[in-house]
């Protein structure tokens, strides 16, 4: 009985992590791409300026956006289709690792990279659970 309860708890933790990551990514890329936040790289006030601050072209921002939104939606789908969770988490984790590297590249204070580090950590947990 205890093992069963533990499995249910772990499954709920996994679902919570998937939804936290997915909704956070969708918030940034769909609801707030043009809004300033304290976490944008460099002195950027929106996503386009942030990618420019990293020295990355607009087309690259579009590719990253499509990948992040697609992988976030895959994490939502993984609530029902469990086999999708690990590849989606690994893909998003790699993109978040890239985000951390870009923050380091432009010498941002660590506080600006904290959301990317947090999402990277949650993606690692999803991939390993």
Where on the chain are the PLM-derived regions?
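Membrane-interface extramembranous regions
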Residues: 2-129
């Amino acid at each position: 009985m205890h093992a069963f309860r533990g499995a249910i708890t772990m499954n709920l933790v996994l679902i919570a992590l998937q939804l936290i990551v997915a909704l956070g990514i969708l918030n940034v890329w769909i609801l707030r791409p043009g809004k300033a936040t304290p976490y944008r790289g460099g002195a950027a006030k929106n996503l386009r300026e942030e990618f420019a601050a990293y020295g990355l072209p607009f087309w690259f921002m579009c590719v990253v956006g499509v990948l992040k939104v697609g992988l976030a939606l895959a994490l939502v789908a993984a609530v029902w289709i469990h086999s999708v969770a690990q590849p989606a988490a690994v893909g998003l984790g790699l993109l978040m690792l890239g985000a951390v590297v870009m923050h380091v590249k432009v010498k941002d204070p660590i506080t600006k990279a904290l959301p990317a580090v947090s999402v990277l950590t949650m993606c690692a947990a999803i991939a390993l659970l």
